């Protein structure tokens, strides 16, 4: 039986904007109030996803969230018609309106944590949506995320969907952005690496001083329990608090893994050598490649600006690994030099492919942010909603859909335009028909 690691990319929503909502994310803050292009952003994302499908990889798409989120605005006291709710929020609480208009669900690395059937006791693929409690604009996503995941992976024989963790900072969970999996083959049992920023219940444990640690050890342990993982298939690693304070808000900004390769920065973790030894021990003597990037070659700021580690490492059909990198990596002298050297070092990584995802990058999300990885066998892949899998037909339909419904430009002041509600809902209603998702949105209930 064939085994794959499918990437499910987030489709950029119609309200993609630069509101600077993500404290701790340097790119997000630096581009606050810039004019965005929802149409360009969506097309850049689709182009990247289609390119991976054309490389022979399993590739799907996840639908965006409904924005503006009038349901949340009504929950916090704004009343009247939809237009009146929007108008009141714009005048009385513009920051809350911006939070309720974010298209941040496009970064599906934060949508959920996924454990494949090879690792779980019941032999099913487990999904737990991330609660994302650290950021208001993302904390309103999990319920709809769960709906979309259930409509995409819609066969209970193969897929087990959990509710998101309790909505409290002690269980702060940011999903797959703080999780990676090492294995010899996608279909073999692997080691799941859970990276956390702090221990919520231990006030004496190290934690960052400037920026928040969004993932807790307690959340990571809860996910491992829910997903029926045993101790031998789980490793819990603390991210270096110092790099969080330098803008490394998720682990996928400082490390990335694929099969038997862990690619990480020298400063990424606490107790690095001890944890690498634990991984090696649990890998039972099979070949592992730890690729450590020294600070002397790539500093933390260059890593963050270029998103060197927010790249995707994929295994091509010929068995070689390739890095899927943003063009920003080409534009950074130190990073570009390192990547050119990397492919000559005798590791499994032999190629680098560059993609323009600047609309996403300016909001603080690179190629790895845009995808949720799901390792599966051919039977499980066949059980996925076929209308969510990338091919020529879906690519063309979604591009036409974007062209029809998305604005070329969107300024922050445009978020108060009632017409944006109509445009967004019309687009999403049509999208649920294209992808055959059913009624996953609040306005469709």
UniProtKB/Swiss-Prot annotation:
Hydrolase as a keyword? yes
Keyword Hydrolase found:
yes
Q: In which pathway does it act?
A: Amino-acid degradation; L-arginine degradation via AST pathway; L-glutamate and succinate from L-arginine: step 2/5
**Keywords, A to Z?**
Arginine metabolism, Hydrolase
InterPro entries on file: AstB_sf, SuccinylArg_d-Hdrlase_AstB
Top enzyme class: hydrolase
Q: Which positions are annotated as binding substrate?
A: 19-28, 110, 137-138, 214, 252, 363
Catalysed reaction, written as an equation:
N(2)-succinyl-L-arginine + 2 H2O + 2 H(+) = N(2)-succinyl-L-ornithine + 2 NH4(+) + CO2
Q: Which PANTHER family match?
A: N-SUCCINYLARGININE DIHYDROLASE (PTHR30420:SF2)
Record note on quaternary structure: Homodimer.
Q: Which HAMAP family match?
A: AstB
Name by which UniProt lists this protein? N-succinylarginine dihydrolase
Protein species of origin: Shewanella loihica (strain ATCC BAA-1088 / PV-4)
